[in-house]
From Swiss-Prot:
Belongs to the transient receptor (TC 1.A.4) family. It comes from Caenorhabditis elegans. ANK repeats lie at residues 49-79, 83-112, 116-169, 173-202, 206-235, 239-270, 277-306, 311-340, 344-374, 378-407, 411-440, 473-502, 506-535, 540-569, 573-602, 605-634, 638-669. Its main location: membrane. This is Transient receptor potential cation channel subfamily A member 1 homolog.
Amino acid sequence: MSKKSLGLDVRLELEGLISNDDTIRSEKDGRQASIFRVAELDARTEADNLRSIIHQSAREGNVNALQEALLKAPLAVNAQDGDFMTPLHYAARYGNYDAVKLLLSKNALPNTKNREGDTPLHIASKYIYGYSDICSIIDEDQADSARKYNTATKKIINALVSENAEIDPVNKYQLTPLHYAAMKSNFSALHALIKLKADVDAEDDNKMTPLLLACVHGSQEIIQELIKANSNVTKRDQRLNTVFHIVALRGEPEYLEMMMDHDPVEAIKALNLFNNEKKTPLRMAVEGNHPETLKKILQMEKKNSCKWMDREKELIHFAAEKGFLEVLKALVEAGGNKNELNEVKAVPLHVAAQMNQLEVVSYLIEEEKDNIDVVDEQGLTPLMMAVTHDSKKCVEYLIAKKANLTITDKDERTPVFIGAKFNALSSVEYILDHLRKKNKETERSALKSPTRNTLRIVSEDVRRTMVNMVDRDQNTPMHIVASNGYLEMMQLLQKHGASITQVNEDEETALHRAAIGGQTGAVRQLLEWDIRLLLMKDEMGNSALHLAARSGHDATTKVLLDNGADKEAKNSYQKTPLQVAVDSGKLETCQRLVAKGAQIESSSDTKTVLHTAAFYGNESIVRYFIAEGVTIDRRDEEGKTAFDIACENDHKDVARAFLETDQWKNLMIPCDVIPLDKHRNPVNMKRRTPFRTLLTKFPELASFVMDNCIEKSKEETDSTQSVAYNFEFLDDTYMMRCVSDDGTGEQLIGCKSAYDEDFKLEKDAQSYASNYDRVYKYHPLKLMADAEKLHLLNHPLSKALLKYKWNRLGRPMYYFALFMYLVFIVSLTQYVRHTKAPYNVWNEESYYDSEYFDENETCPQINTTKPDVVWKIIIQTLAVCQILVECFQLFQRKFAYLVNWENWIDCFIYSTALITVYDFSECSATSGVRQNWQWILAALCIFFGWINLLFMIRKMPRFGIFVVMFVDIVKTFFRFFPVFVLFIIAFSSSFYVILQNRPEFSTIFMSPLKTTVMMIGEFEFTGIFHGDETTHAEKMFGPAHTAVACALFFFFCIIMTILLMNLLVGLAVDDIKGVQEKAELKRLAMQVDLVLQIEASLHFFIQRTKKYATCRYATFPYGKLHKTGFAGWWSNFRRRFGLSVSTDPEIDEMYEREAEFTSEMTQKLQNQAAKLKNIQENIDVMYEKQVRLEAIIAKLATGLNINIELEEKDN
């Protein structure tokens, strides 16, 4: 048998199977079951049979069989079946007293509970008849007699209780046997339980007592028996219902009367009790439509101090609404006011008429004929209320009773108007037919005696027919039904002379209202009646097509267009239906209008539909109109394109839709204008370009634009490929100067390119800010760095611009300045190194005092070597040049120069260097020894000079990141410094007090310094605590003195050298980690700062020459890939140290990326090869196991004479 025929796909471990298993035999081997197992099975089967016999015998009352079975299995007397029922449960369930006695004599447990928690006492109380009684009892009288005088139940209950059965056990629902007896009307059980002192006021889960359950489910005898047993009639269930609530709702006057006779006082009190639905027994009787019960309660209410009319509100309204006529009459006869007002000031007649309760309406009108036209707070009469629900019978009756048909409500609506609004077709038709008949009768009577007065009345009735009477807003019934689309009602009104051209206060016709509501059928019907309705406009000049388009009703729009509606009609805002649809964002309607020939744009309109769609952020509409060929770069009155509007209103998806078009470059052209003063200096204004807006709001879209600014001439694999970078939007420093619009001055405009055909600056190009620090601060590259947009800074276009600026100007200027500064600082160091300190000059006998050179003009013959005059000249020359450069920068950058602390350090270094090398006395000139204050100044100058070199190196991409780490650590330390100082002050003050005799702690100023030094490990423990006791400066004064000093020293070692120093190290590590995580961002940000600062320093020459700036830059990526030998090594060396002459930002990292990519791909291929090998091995193992499994299955099938036939199926 092949593995395909088996069709098995399983994973089994077959090693554990025994190939020669002797326990597996065929039928021929004649294997037999164990005799011990057969005996065990037979015993278990016999026990189960005995338990079944015991349960069955107890159920059937077969005492002999039960006794015989119990003799064989006495322990099965309490056996439970699947429902946890014992034989005692079944015997009690079917009223088998003899079986109950036998079971109890055999030690049956009377308190055992079944699955529902019922004991045998529960079961005996719950079920009334025995098993044999059910078939024998036929008539109802016999059933009542059996229920009342069932002696078996009493005997069973007494027997159970005599054997210590609990009298009030509760099941899982907290029901006692007495609850069951009351619920099932088991009188015998109830009587027996009460006699045995069962709790008549026990409560179940719903706080229902037996009396409450009896009122719901029981009989009069049960209730009477419970009342005799002093059951509490004031108990309330979980819904706060009393027995009076329940019997009132059920409508049992006998029960109610019985409880009233039992305790009249409590009955009266119960009338004032509310349940959780805020209902009294009186209200429940009304809601249950039980007039007899209601009359009993009303009789009791006469004795109640709290009158039911004051307590109960709108009872008559409820009865009138439901049509409970007898209940209504009973309430009225008991003193109820049938003209009572509810919360909306309506009388019961309103409610009855509304719900079409004709009998109630008739009764109320017959009693009070003057109330036929009574109104509620909305001014609605009973006739109007009947019309709202199309209660035709009541309408006919009220009209027959002379109800006023011309009366109006507070909104001046007639019954016909209200019926039209609620589409009460039959009622309105009846009213209109009635009015037509009445008008004809009036006409005939008037024509018989044609006086001037009667003729005037007839003509006025004709003119003001009911179907054309308007409401407060001048809407006719036709307006309302048209807006709701009630076609049959429209036809009915039109049949009776309704006007379709009448307008409301907004000058809207019924067609306008139908168009607003999108009622296509109503629109079609109105146009069939009068096509001229298309020409009518509302007070805002909107046609029906305008209104349908604004609401986005596509089908209605189609009907209007098919009937010849004007597609180019303009409303008071000079908007066409298409523009209105765009305002509302209705794409389907726009498509419908365009498909029908609506004009998308006009040459006279500055604002197109795209501007509107972009303002509201309707991306789908924008894309649709772009596909239709709308001009996307048209500008409105403010010079903004639709793209500008989308960006201003933060509609990112709309902006993306514009940028995905072929005309994206036209959208990126700025339209900002910066005025010039009389000196041709721009006023202080920020540039507002589309690209800057994208940088601020949508960086992802800015990256998309930057991608489009890179053009490649050929495929990536072509070695002759060239890449062109367009910097026009990224480097927007320059604008074109032209005459202002009013001709009185000049201005800078952004809509015209500042570059010529050769991509160089035009003659009239000018920076948009005279202070180039503003250009530096708000340059797009700087904005990217400040916002930490690494993906934008790392974009090839940004890197290309940085590389271009660095190679053309930044690199030569930076390295030239760095070289000159190195020459200066090295010369200053050499000069100081070869100059003797004023306190270190030897006079053949001793050293001179340093003040000697400050006080004497001439020097004695001293043996010292003067520094070479070359160093002095170099220092003076470079310092003077640098000071002039700083003055020039101050002139150019003005206040911005002063706020930069690096400029102050430069000025300090160069000025102090000049002062240091200057000879202020003849002694200094002849000996070269500086005066004391000069020497101190030289120390500060040399320190800040080298530190300044550190900050200059910080701007180098390769090494600057480490300086950034150091600066971040210093900043963190100074944030921690207040805590650090407090520890220093605490320990130094204590050491000053306890070790004041020692020189290092002798003053309050030296002690902090020594304490700080001790933090780095210079403790001098032996010198402090084990010095010469004979010397005052090393002596410890007594044991207490020594103990305090040791304790302080111990805490100092723990806190300052271990805890505090480790804390500082941890903070430093975190700072370094943070810088490393943003290393690429920091590097690019520093490069941006360096390049832009150099431009800011030299912008005067840049703008004069106009040769440096460009908007387009092309490279050949594969131009240097063929360099080998020394040329390749030299190129790599220059690239590593930022000296590469390459102008392509991608080439500098190409080798590294290729190496990383190759290494990564190699590793992935190796991992995949290993995985494939592992998979192949697993497949081989699975195949072997499957073959073995097939062999085993085949042997088993052969041994068991099983024929296996499997069909082959294609996977």
